[in-house]
UniProtKB/Swiss-Prot annotation:
Name of the molecule in the record: Aldehyde reductase 1
E.C. number(s) listed in UniProt: 1.1.1.2
Organism: Sporidiobolus salmonicolor
Activity regulation annotation text: Inhibited by quercetin, dicoumarol and some SH-reagents.
Keyword NADP set for record: yes
Lineage, highest ranks first: Eukaryota, Fungi, Dikarya, Basidiomycota, Pucciniomycotina
Entry annotation: catalytic residues: 49 (proton donor)
Site (Lowers pKa of active site Tyr): 74
Gene behind this protein: ARI
Job of this protein: Catalyzes the asymmetric reduction of aliphatic and aromatic aldehydes and ketones to an R-enantiomer. Reduces ethyl 4-chloro-3-oxobutanoate to ethyl (R)-4-chloro-3-hydroxybutanoate.
Binding site for NADP(+): 210-267
Length: 323
């Protein structure tokens, strides 16, 4: 039985969800069907993953009651201007064939200008190497428009993703509305204890993405780390199961992605770690072990904006416009 948590709206959320990032069209639909058959009821989607129509068809085929699913999607960067927010939500609902989302997040604290067909032109280019940024619209502007969605019946809860404490404080101060969730990169190499303590005090739930680390930067995989493998062997489980069990300690949720049926099942199976094992996993991210994998200014094309204050972002010309 998968553990659950209660959001600040009173809604119940399963701690292990099914992620659809980097799941290729043609594979993701089958993955979603297998996930629902396995027992997953928390699905994490986004406009920019470019696979929502297929996910929507798979949800329909799976034949589970809508109210038994918890479905999250995300507002993309080119729809941050207040007048674009509801149309972007409508586009996502249309792609999914749904009447409402359980949770809608601002995907990044970064805005792109709405150019051309904004349902398709997701990365307007400044030039061959860079994405064009919209430095006029603020996070507060976008959050105010998100708050208005709550009255439409099209979303049950709203939240953010990739926001730091300062950004979260600013949107709460401006509107009096606290995000239900902040979805952040979190794994044993990126512990973020200050952000976690801040969110706990404000009753903001944390969902961890990239819980198994990330294989896009050519770094050694976390699932192959000797310490993770040792703990897996000791507990008679897989390294991925160790990382997922570690991630949900403290009541956080996690959204591992796989399109392989056996792995989808493995990721859903609950493993309990001793405190000693939890501490051993956490030690990996202390000191020089720390690593953030998802930094927009390292993307190609580059987003020339400092989001997290990481070393790699110091040369960025632009900062996040908070208010």
């Amino acid at each position: 039985m998968v553990g659950t948590t209660t959001l600040n709206t009173g809604a119940s959320l399963e701690l292990v969800g099914y992620g659809t990032w980097q799941a290729a069209p043609g594979e993701v639909g089958q993955g979603v069907k297998v996930a629902i058959e396995t027992g997953y009821r928390h699905l994490d989607l986004a406009k920019v993953y470019s696979n929502q129509p297929e996910v929507g068809a798979a949800i329909k085929e799976a034949g589970v009651k809508r109210e038994d699913l918890f479905i999250t999607s995300k507002l993309w960067n080119n729809s941050h201007r207040p007048e674009q927010v509801e149309p972007a939500l409508d586009d996502t609902l249309k792609e999914l064939g749904l009447e409402y989302l359980d949770l809608y997040l601002i995907h990044w604290p970064v805005a792109f200008p709405p150019e051309g067909d904004i349902t398709q032109n997701l990365f307007p280019k400044a030039n061959d190497k860079e994405v064009k940024l919209d430095l006029e619209v603020s996070l507060v502007d976008t959050w105010k428009a998100m708050v208005k969605l709550l009255d439409t019946g099209k979303v049950k809860a709203i939240g953010v993703s990739n926001f730091d404490a300062k950004m979260v404080d600013a949107i709460i101060e401006a509107t009096g509305v606290t995000p239900s969730v902040n979805q952040i990169e979190r794994h044993p190499l990126l512990l973020q204890p200050e952000l976690i303590a801040h969110h706990k005090a404000k009753n903001i739930h944390i969902t961890a993405y990239s819980p198994l680390g990330n294989n896009t930067v050519g770094a050694p995989l976390l699932v192959q780390h000797p310490e993770i493998k040792r703990i897996a062997e000791k507990n008679g489980c897989t390294p991925a199961q160790v990382l997922i069990a570690w991630a949900i300690v403290g009541g956080h949720s996690v959204i591992p992605k796989s399109v392989t049926p056996s792995r989808i099942g493995e990721n859903f199976k609950q493993v309990s770690l001793s405190q000693e094992d939890v501490d051993a996993v956490s030690k990996l991210g202390e000191g020089s072990g720390r690593r953030r994998y998802n930094i927009p200014c390292t993307y190609s094309p580059k987003w020339d904006i400092n989001v997290f204050g990481e070393e790699d972002e110091k040369s960025c010309k632009n900062a996040v416009k908070i208010k």
